[in-house]
Amino acid sequence: MQNPTTTPGSLLTAMRANPPLVQCITNFVAMNIAANVMLAAGASPAMVHAEEEAGEFAAISGALTINIGTLSTGWLAGMTSAAQAANKAGKPWVLDPVAHYATSFRRRSVAQLLELQPTIIRGNASEIIALAGGTSRGQGVDSRDPVELAEEAAVQLAQKHRTIVAVTGATDFVTDGNKASRIEGGSPLMPQVTALGCSLTCLVGAFAATRPDHPLDATVAALAAFAVAGERAGRQVDGPGSFSWRFLDALAALDEKAIDSEARVISL
């Protein structure tokens, strides 16, 4: 991590002491679970995406997250306005380029958003490989590439765009183009619950709002909290249905000691 005196647990404590308002421009599938994940973690989500107000709302939020899962021309206008406002206000923002490789509209839209210099990019391995110009095996919104194959692409992407890149999957990888960490944990049931990855993007935004001066630390902390909650929930259930609500309970029950004792963060 960038700052060895900052732990994931201490950032969770700081976030809950001053819950950040996070504008989550996310897809229709993810809105409900993402809002619940944010509330369980201790943040304040706002699912505001309309072009007419997205920029104004971004200016008063602690952070912005943009997810292109259910993209349209109107949504893109709102995303662009919000990102511009976040930049002007000095607020961190996170880009989640969901299945950007799938259509020309998505590719053009992500290229436009990248020009606005996201603070953090979070995606699965296939998305990150393709975003760096490689050939991925993504199928729709699902990754068919292991995280390990995306690590080099993540470093290149971080260096090119001067951003933090997080590749999430069975094991997560986070880099600023120089330093890097792996985060182990979670549960094999997590990919069977829709929109958990999209929800993680929102949580990254919440931690970034808490520590805007150290987005690498913030990203690692968010992923560590998610992994510990997923691992705890996975030990209590037999399938994805019960996992979804157990995960929210586990996330709400996390505290500083639990994360710092159970998180498996490996600095590379």
Curated annotation (Swiss-Prot):
This is Hydroxyethylthiazole kinase. It catalyses: 5-(2-hydroxyethyl)-4-methylthiazole + ATP = 4-methyl-5-(2-phosphooxyethyl)-thiazole + ADP + H(+). Catalyzes the phosphorylation of the hydroxyl group of 4-methyl-5-beta-hydroxyethylthiazole (THZ). It is an enzyme of class 2 (transferase). It holds the Pfam family HK. ATP binds at R122, T168. Its EC number is 2.7.1.50. It comes from Rhizobium rhizogenes (strain K84 / ATCC BAA-868) (Agrobacterium radiobacter). The keyword Protease does not apply. Signal peptide: none annotated. GO terms for molecular function: ATP binding; hydroxyethylthiazole kinase activity; magnesium ion binding. Belongs to the Thz kinase family. The keyword Ligase does not apply. Its cofactor is Mg(2+). Gene3D superfamilies: 3.40.1190.20. One of its GO terms (biological process) is thiamine biosynthetic process. Pathway: Cofactor biosynthesis; thiamine diphosphate biosynthesis; 4-methyl-5-(2-phosphoethyl)-thiazole from 5-(2-hydroxyethyl)-4-methylthiazole: step 1/1. Keywords: ATP-binding, Kinase, Magnesium, Metal-binding, Nucleotide-binding, Thiamine biosynthesis, Transferase.
